[in-house]
Amino acid sequence: MKIWSSEHVFGHPWDTVIKAAMRKYPNPMNPCVVGVDVLERSVDGCGRLHSLRLLSTEWGLPGLVRAILGANRTLTYIKERSVVDPAARKMELCSTNITLTNLVSVNERLVYTPHPENPEKTVLTQEAIITVKGISLGSYLESLMATTISSNAKKGWAAIEWIIEHSESAIS
């Protein structure tokens, strides 16, 4: 098992970042996400928005990794649940893979909150738990996947900035 975590501060207010995060895919920074389907969306009695989405991703796995995993399939699916609580000014998003679960599990949690000292900024904390199951070189693959998650997190931050920038230019 490998645990990866990170914190990133956006130079934008929470509501701006959340609107962009909800429209994060597709984006040119991370073209491996090839589809997003909203399966459920509802608002509860406390005004929290609950969403369940299915993300379709195309991972260009290196030949060595495909050989170790014994899988030629590179199209994978991810289940993403999110809760946006406007009263608490918090968005929590949890995702897990639903493809290749017999080989690997990746559970990711993202939390967006206003910066505690500057309301014009937003803090994103991320954590991923990666477990490769029953494969030799499992710890190597877990480290490789953690590196990929780190790279994709940076692409995600850039995508949110890109969406905000393009939303603001469309308004002005």
UniProtKB/Swiss-Prot annotation:
Alphabetic keyword roster: Lipid transport, Mitochondrion, Transport
Record-linked PROSITE patterns: PRELI_MSF1
Domain PRELI/MSF1: 1-172
Cellular component terms per the entry's GO annotation: mitochondrial intermembrane space; mitochondrion
Principal place of residence: mitochondrion
UniProt-annotated location(s): Mitochondrion
GO molecular function, one term: phosphatidic acid transfer activity
Residues carrying the site annotation Important for interaction with TRIAP1: V36, L49
Disulfide bonds: none
Record note on quaternary structure: Interacts with TRIAP1.
Functional summary from the UniProt entry: In vitro, the TRIAP1:PRELID3A complex mediates the transfer of phosphatidic acid (PA) between liposomes and probably functions as a PA transporter across the mitochondrion intermembrane space. Phosphatidic acid import is required for cardiolipin (CL) synthesis in the mitochondrial inner membrane.
Protein family (similarity comment): Belongs to the slowmo family.
Protein name according to UniProt: PRELI domain containing protein 3A
Species of provenance: Mus musculus (Mouse)
Gene transcribed to yield this protein: Prelid3a
